[in-house]
Amino acid sequence: MYKQIFVILIFGCVVAAGCNSTRMFSRGDKSMQNGRYEEAITYYDKGLNRSDNYEASLNKGIAQWKVREYSNAENSFADAIKASPENAPLAYYYRAELGFKTGNIDEALKDVNKALYQDPLNVQALNLRGRICTLQGRYAAAIEDLNAAIAIEGESRISGYLYHNRAIAYIGKDDFKSARDDCELFIRFLRKNNLPVTVEDNYLLGVLQYAVDDEDGALTSWQHMPTEEKAKIGRIVGNSNSMYHFKEAQ
């Protein structure tokens, strides 16, 4: 009789702890949705003190990233991976992004490879690996990953940035025509979504257009730049007919 009561009491404590953890995780999720990241971290901590949970550890890491607690975020992503090592693609991806951000490129590549092994259709992971490959000078591999990401993503709020990153990889291969085409797609994407086109964006597009003998296109792109920058370009590119009119327009 006493043994049965003891078992029931223990079971009740376990259930209560699980319910409390779930409540804390739910509060953490709500705080995350409202952008209250430090509050979310507190709730996740309370829940994780009672039980391990992949999603809670992952979200805690993301919240810590948001408030620039990078070392703590890395530990949380590691906890998430430990809680679900065979199904942790997002934890591997975020830890890879963190490694890339902090300059730990080799470890970032290992993690993003694991993320893509578990989820081959993760567009953000494909994009990250493409950027890493570009940084390492493996331009063909970068383009392959970015091609896959673009094919999966289609037209969306991030597709333009995939074109931009692929343009950088094409530049590494000295394929300036493909780079020009991607850069044009990127700027078209920015304008379509009412996003700012920077001086650097126009400069890069103009350089690529000039590299493939599209002087008129380069002229149009560079006209959006400040007068001082246009003067520098005019001195660099020489005295072709188009550039003569470009200088006259300054």
PLM regions with names:
Residues 192, 196-250:
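Terminal, low-structured helical/coil segments at or just beyond the last alpha-helical repeat
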Residues 51-52, 85-86, 120, 154-157, ...:
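Short coil turns that delineate tetratricopeptide repeat
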Residues 45-49, 78-83, 113-117, 148-154, ...:
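Conserved structural position within tetratricopeptide repeats
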Residues 21-22, 54-55, 88-90, 123-124, ...:
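Helix-start (N-cap) detector for alpha-helical repeat units in TPR-like alpha-solenoids
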Residues 59, 93-94, 128, 165, ...:
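Canonical tetratricopeptide repeat
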Residues 33-34, 66-69, 101-102, 135-136, ...:
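Register position in tetratricopeptide repeats
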